[in-house]
Amino acid sequence: MFRRLNDAQIQYRAARGSGDKRGLLVVSSGGIGDSILFSLMIERFITLVGDDDPVTLVVRSESLGVGFLFPSRVNLIGVDYRRFIRDGAYKRQVCAELRALNVQIAISSDHLRLPTVDDVMVMATGAAQKFALRPRTWPKHDRALAQHEAWYT
C-alpha cells in the first residue's frame, strides 16, 4: 500500500514539473557487462538532443566503474536498485534528483524492465517525451507493465 502511495506522489510531482525542458535521460538497468555494451550505443541516443543539451545515463551503482567508457558529455547517475525498491525515502530522493534534471526526453533502454524501478524513474522525470522498448513477457510484472504503457509517448 505504501509503495502505491509513494508512486502516486512521485507521479503527481512529475506532472507539476517546470516548463522549459531540455536534455536526455536514459535508464540502462543492466549489469556491468550490459553497461559496457551500452557504451557502444549511447552515441545513437545522444543524437536525439542538441549539441548543448545535457545527457544523463542512470545505471546500477555497481556499473559506475565503467563510466570512463562513455563520452565525457554523459553524466552518470548510479542507483542502488534493491534499495530503490525497498526504501521509500531513497526512492523519493532519487526521483526528486531525476525530476530536477528537467529533461525533454526520457528513455528506458531495457527489454526486460522492472515496473517498480525503470518505469517509476522514467515517469518521475516528468519528461515531455517518454519512450521504452516493448517489454518481454514477464508473468510476474505483465499487469503492471501493461498499465504503465499509458505513461509512454
Mark where each language-model region is.
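Catalytic machinery of carbohydrate-active enzymes
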Residues: M1-T153
